[in-house]
């Protein structure tokens, strides 16, 4: 077992950014063929939390090996140990899935920042009937709230699922400041009785997403995140069924 904390080097000129930045991805890769990806942390106290993750098997797991290799190197690992994972060839997985499944590998220091920041607003703009969102920490920006208002004008039912209480008191207080403006924009907020750490989204019956991204500025600007979006109808239906279960519990 080898362990290296993220960001081993230190530079005075960007010490604040390094202080805020962290690797928030939650990805488990087993034998290069099985991947668990979502919001699950590894710590004893988190066992009591509800969470959500996606399991991928076979060639579908290969594109994430490249992201792991980059994190391994940036954490101080020897590049030679993961060189074979850095080739683009790993991303050429089963052709039939290429248009049905896309990985979201977000880094605050890369061009993926706008993409990561627009994930939720762009998805909401696509909705025609229903938009479901699960996030434990909720600090929406103006673009997201505007997207909620426009969606309601189109007749879209916007459902946002949040835990009634979280493990971060400050984050909970900040989220409460947005409840009223969010409902006035047209969304329905469902409060879950237990701590739910999952991060997921569905757009109608057409699109689903599971990952580690919270709807907060910190998640977009300072954290490395991972997720997977999918359009496979069975996968989206299953995720919508989970949202229906959450609605019954709220």
Predicted regions, residues:
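Charged, low-complexity intrinsically disordered terminal segments
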Residues: 1-250
């Amino acid at each position: 077992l080898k362990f290296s904390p993220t960001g081993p080097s230190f530079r005075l000129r960007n010490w604040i950014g390094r202080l805020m930045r962290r690797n928030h991805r939650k990805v488990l890769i087993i034998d290069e063929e099985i991947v668990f990806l979502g919001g699950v942390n590894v710590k004893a106290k988190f066992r009591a939390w509800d969470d959500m993750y996606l399991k991928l098997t076979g060639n579908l797991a290969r594109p994430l090996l490249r992201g792991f290799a980059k994190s391994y190197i940036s954490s101080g690992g020897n590049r030679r140990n993961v060189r074979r994972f850095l080739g683009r060839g790993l991303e050429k997985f089963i052709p039939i899935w290429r248009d049905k499944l896309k990985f979201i590998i977000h880094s605050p220091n890369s061009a993926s920042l706008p993409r990561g920041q627009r994930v939720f607003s762009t998805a909401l703009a696509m909705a025609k009937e229903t938009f479901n969102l699960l996030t434990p920490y909720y600090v929406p920006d103006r673009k997201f709230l505007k997207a909620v208002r426009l969606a309601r004008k189109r007749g879209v039912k916007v459902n946002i699922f949040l835990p009634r209480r979280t493990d971060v008191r400050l984050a909970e207080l900040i989220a409460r400041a947005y409840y009223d403006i969010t409902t006035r924009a047209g969304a329905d907020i469902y409060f879950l009785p237990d701590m739910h750490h999952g991060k997921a989204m569905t757009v109608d019956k057409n699109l689903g997403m599971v990952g580690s991204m919270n709807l907060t500025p910190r998640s977009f600007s300072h954290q490395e995140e991972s997720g997977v979006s999918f359009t496979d109808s069975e996968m989206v239906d299953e995720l919508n069924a989970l949202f229906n279960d959450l609605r019954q519990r709220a």
